[in-house]
Amino acid sequence: PGLPVLELPAWDCLPYDRVSPGADAAARRLDALTAMIALVKRPHRAVILTTANALLQRIPPASLIEAQTFHARPGNQIDMNALVSRLETSGFERVPTVRGVGEFAVRGGILDLFAPGWTEALRLDFFGDTLESIRVFDAATQRTTGQRKSMALQAMSEVALTPETISRFRRSYIEAFGAPSRDDGLYAAVSEGRRFAGMEHWLPFFYERLETVFDYLPDTPVVFDHLAHEALAERHALILDHYE
């Protein structure tokens, strides 16, 4: 009783699908993975609820997820254009008006964003390269509801389109399939640093290695329910079926 509970869902799409995980599932996963990293860095007790599907799914190394987290507070010197680029490579979607998790909008020196793990959106007010204030606002009404002294910004996708990951993807893709054709939309989009529907299913091509939940939390006691082994076997069979 009283222990924090972290929920790690699986992607809400089929294995090797041509669509990306939904924004809500992606946000909840990144929120949980970031919290799991914090459990190791600042040890404390917690309960992690997950599924057979999520348990079988490989994930980016914890060090890379942690490196994507951005911390800021009023008074910091921040290149707004660099922050916008960071949001785009981390999986955020640029929109005219922020309404949901995973979105950001820019109007002059104001940057609105709604990140994983947040209950409300934030409005960053810049004067030049100085972050003057962090205001909380209601995404439905766009009205300010409070102030923040700091923020921690997580990634929105398990695929960060950095020069390193793009280069690794291109190399891995060519090694696996040879020279891409001109109409290969996936290869072209990633090469240009653009996100492409379903690219998360190519996760091993973006990173040197992947990890599991057990790599994030070594020596952690695991409790299975009575149908867990059957669920794991069914998921494994589904993965093989879609692969073939």
Residue positions per predicted region:
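ASCE RecA-like P-loop NTPase motor cores
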Residues: 1-244
